[in-house]
Amino acid sequence: MSEYFSNIKTSATTIATGMGITLKHFFNAVKRKGDAGIDDADYFRQVDGLCTLQYPKEAIPTPPHGRYRLYCNIDDCIGCRQCDRACPVQCITIETIKATSDDLEACGKTSGGQQKRMWVPVFDIDVAKCMTCGICVSVCPTECLYHTPVADFSEFNVKNMMYHFGNLSKIEAEAKTKKLAEQQAQAAKEKAAAGGAPGAKPAPKPKPAPPQA
Amino acid sequence: MSSSPSLNTWSDALSGLSIGWFPLGLVIIAAIPLVFIALYALTYGVYGERKISAFMQDRLGPMEVGIWGLLQTLADILKLLQKEDIVPKLADKFLFVIGPGILFVGSFLAFAVLPFGPAFIGADLNVGLFYAVGIVAIEVVGILAAGWGSNNKWALYGAVRSVAQIVSYEIPASIALLCAAMLAGTLSMQQITMMQAGPGGFMHWFLFTNPIAWLPFLIYFISSLAETNRAPFDIPEAESELVAGYFTEYSGMKFAVIFLAEYGRMFMVSAIISIAFLGGWTSPLPNIGGLELNTMTSGPVWGAFWIIMKGFFFIFVQMWLRWTLPRLRVDQLMYLCWKVLTPFSLIAFVLTAIWVINH
Ligand code: SF4
Ligand code: SF4
């Protein structure tokens, strides 16, 4: 019997407490939680008030050094494909064409002064797949691949999440491929004319035997 | 009991009005609560509940349509009107279609006896309170029709739960209201209100004139939550277990009618609790010395204002509870009804009887 009454008492007090809390929140709705960003010292002190963010109109600023959307500065890319190989989710697609010797001038140099030797007609990043892990960024020798502070890049059509960065149009790419093939054919012909037997490569050295355990 | 003519001047005059054979006055009297329910359900019921629930959860609620989302409800109505009115192929079509109708009629019928002011009451029955309690039970039929007619297991579960719940909670609710009827010595809503009118304002209300009225008051309030299917007694709906309970299959305007009925019932029970314990349309302000606050704030228009405000206050409490408490389990629900509320209502009944005899 005493349990019966204590249960009733517990229900009454807990309901009263709960209703007190909700009423407090109801009256606190005249306040707004501040818009302190995560790097603000007051971030965890914004306890009272509404927390709805009316998103497109209001947005919490992202940190200026944030690392979100991947960007490739294609002018600096040397087409080494390191990023392509490093990416764990295969979201980078690269195609390269070797620049012919007379094109090296047109191909240009990176901002670091390195001579570029590859055209990169296709450099696609599927930002829908990219998990911003940053592995590609760390392997890129010319530091032309990096994350930007842009955090909001949603699209209505998932196809638009494919970002194209290539530095040649399709027609240009075809021309360059043809040119390269011609040059290579030319070189092969010259080589044959010079009389070098094609199969005269020195035999590869035998590998050293693995150490015996 | 025939009420004094001064009590019902407006409604009596209206009901006598007719154009030829057409009883225009009666139609107007019937339309007044309908217009009231519609307006209140749209503004306070739907929009208010959204905002209140949002604020209690630190959200903003609707904001996009109109200033502060004020036109959101209108947009929703337009949307509901456009929706296809689906009747499931294997449903019992007759029951399925009339279910929402019965539900709405059940909550609407009780408005006939609610006094909306000292000069307006649809029907001043001498058994008004009894009628109001009884007519609520029609809701059970509507819910059963909707749940069974849907030919859907969730809907049927919801309906059966609802019947168990409403039938059970009618008992403590009725006994608690009996206490008020005993205090007043009448079942007429208008008379019960008159008993609590006086220059002292709130001091004449049953809740404050006797020491035990708080107990039936609380019991009726809790039971009324269960009768209107409001949280924490919304197990017929139970959207997380039963999808949406007895109205799982309803779409478009039928769904809207079910909700209109729910909001109508919410106001009805709130009005009944105000009439039974908080003086209905009487003003809460007392006359203090020469300051005739009570006299100033009485009259037909003020009366309507006060009862609507009291009703709205209790609806606010219902919403407040809804966003505070989790839903009860079925066994807890029955425990609360049969082992807590019913015995306490009987105790309240006996104590009230003793108090009435000794005064
Ligand atoms: S950040 Fe990671 S996932 Fe994204 S492209 Fe680079 S390696 Fe791939
Ligand atoms: S690692 Fe850098 S330089 Fe190499 S292909 Fe990728 S982006 Fe270009």
Swiss-Prot record, chain B:
<comment type="subunit">
    <text>NDH-1 is composed of 14 different subunits. Subunits NuoA, H, J, K, L, M, N constitute the membrane sector of the complex.</text>
</comment>
<keyword id="KW-0830">Ubiquinone</keyword>
<protein>
    <recommendedName>
        <fullName>NADH-quinone oxidoreductase subunit H</fullName>
        <ecNumber>7.1.1.-</ecNumber>
    </recommendedName>
</protein>
<dbReference type="GO" id="GO:0009060">
    <property type="term" value="P:aerobic respiration"/>
</dbReference>
<feature type="transmembrane region" description="Helical">
    <location>
        <begin position="337"/>
        <end position="357"/>
    </location>
</feature>
<feature type="transmembrane region" description="Helical">
    <location>
        <begin position="266"/>
        <end position="286"/>
    </location>
</feature>
<dbReference type="GO" id="GO:0003954">
    <property type="term" value="F:NADH dehydrogenase activity"/>
</dbReference>
<keyword id="KW-1003">Cell membrane</keyword>
<feature type="transmembrane region" description="Helical">
    <location>
        <begin position="19"/>
        <end position="39"/>
    </location>
</feature>
<keyword id="KW-0874">Quinone</keyword>
<dbReference type="InterPro" id="IPR018086">
    <property type="entry name" value="NADH_UbQ_OxRdtase_su1_CS"/>
</dbReference>
<keyword id="KW-1133">Transmembrane helix</keyword>
<feature type="transmembrane region" description="Helical">
    <location>
        <begin position="94"/>
        <end position="114"/>
    </location>
</feature>
<comment type="function">
    <text>NDH-1 shuttles electrons from NADH, via FMN and iron-sulfur (Fe-S) centers, to quinones in the respiratory chain. The immediate electron acceptor for the enzyme in this species is believed to be ubiquinone. Couples the redox reaction to proton translocation (for every two electrons transferred, four hydrogen ions are translocated across the cytoplasmic membrane), and thus conserves the redox energy in a proton gradient. This subunit may bind ubiquinone.</text>
</comment>
<dbReference type="GO" id="GO:0005886">
    <property type="term" value="C:plasma membrane"/>
</dbReference>
<dbReference type="InterPro" id="IPR001694">
    <property type="entry name" value="NADH_UbQ_OxRdtase_su1/FPO"/>
</dbReference>
<feature type="transmembrane region" description="Helical">
    <location>
        <begin position="202"/>
        <end position="222"/>
    </location>
</feature>
<feature type="transmembrane region" description="Helical">
    <location>
        <begin position="301"/>
        <end position="321"/>
    </location>
</feature>
<dbReference type="GO" id="GO:0016655">
    <property type="term" value="F:oxidoreductase activity, acting on NAD(P)H, quinone or similar compound as acceptor"/>
</dbReference>
<keyword id="KW-0520">NAD</keyword>
<keyword id="KW-0472">Membrane</keyword>
<comment type="similarity">
    <text>Belongs to the complex I subunit 1 family.</text>
</comment>
<dbReference type="Pfam" id="PF00146">
    <property type="entry name" value="NADHdh"/>
</dbReference>
<feature type="transmembrane region" description="Helical">
    <location>
        <begin position="127"/>
        <end position="147"/>
    </location>
</feature>
<keyword id="KW-1278">Translocase</keyword>
<keyword id="KW-0997">Cell inner membrane</keyword>
<keyword id="KW-0812">Transmembrane</keyword>
<feature type="transmembrane region" description="Helical">
    <location>
        <begin position="166"/>
        <end position="186"/>
    </location>
</feature>
<dbReference type="GO" id="GO:0048038">
    <property type="term" value="F:quinone binding"/>
</dbReference>
